[in-house]
Each structure stands twice: as C-alpha cells, then as structure tokens.
Amino acid sequence: MEFQGQHDNPANRVDEYGNPFPLAGAWGERTRSRHRRAVPGPQGRAQDRWILHRSGSSSSSSSSEDDGMGGRRKKGMKEKIKEKLPGGHKDNQQHMATGTGTGGAYGPGTGTGGAYGQQGHTGMAGAGTGTGEKKGIMDKIKEKLPGQH
C-alpha cells in the first residue's frame, strides 16, 4: 500500500491487514516458528506463503466429555482443573457423602462433616504457612476441591 509520495519507503510498508512489515530484510531471519515456502501464484509466478507450525504439545485436554446418554457435553472450568490435578476424580465427578443429620447439607451444625466429608474445616483460621507467603491460585483451588488434603 502506497501513500501520497512515499513510494518504496520501507518504514511505511504495511500488509493487506495494516500490519507493518519488518525492517532491514528480516524476511529470511524470522525468529518465530514460521517457514516460508514458494507456491505457484497467478500467471505462474512464485509467491511467498508463510506456514504456521503447531507446537505439538500434548498438554491440552478435551473441551467436551461423554454425558452418559450417548452424547457429548462441554466441560466446565472446574472439570478441566480437576483433570489436571493429581488424584483428581475424573470418572467419579459427583460424589456426595451419605449419612443422616439434622443440620442440612453442610453437616449437623457444628462445622464438622459436610457434603464432601471434610471434617474439621473451620475456614481460613490457621490456613497460613507461617512464613508470610501468600497462597497461589492453584493452592486456593486445591483447598476447595474434595479429597485434596
């Protein structure tokens, strides 16, 4: 794209999307994981095409799972995090403790027991490490998940 009277000025070159071209002949010296390949273009001339290569990382997880009724459903953020944590319950996602009590779903009213069998949890009291370090996000998430003591 040329602007009024600024022909062949490399500082003002942009591609069809408005992105500036790199200066000083950096076309063959790209540091990204792209490679150039000449492909046949119009009238038999070669055109340069950039090819973006994927990293090949296998750390991603599927965003859907079997819904138990022959179909698929999207996973939520909680399920994805549970899969990545060690000791996560991938197959047994809904596990409620059974028992009798008069305190409702959160235990018999004393703060012990509960829907996930977490006896003795009293909130944030005593949750610090004693060294003045703050907990990370993953530590906070691990505390909230059942079976991660």
UniProtKB/Swiss-Prot annotation:
Region ranges (Disordered): 1-149
Gene Ontology BP annotations: cold acclimation; response to abscisic acid; response to water deprivation
Biased composition (Basic and acidic residues): 78-93, 132-149
Induction: By abscisic acid (ABA) and water stress.
Keyword Nuclease: no
Keywords: Stress response
Pfam families, per database record: Dehydrin
Sequence ranges of Gly residues compositional bias: 100-117
InterPro entries per record: Dehydrin, Dehydrin_CS
Keyword Cell wall biogenesis/degradation: no
PANTHER family, A to Z: DEHYDRIN RAB15, DEHYDRIN XERO 2-RELATED
Family to which the UniProt record says this protein belongs: Belongs to the plant dehydrin family.
Name of the featured protein: Dehydrin Rab15
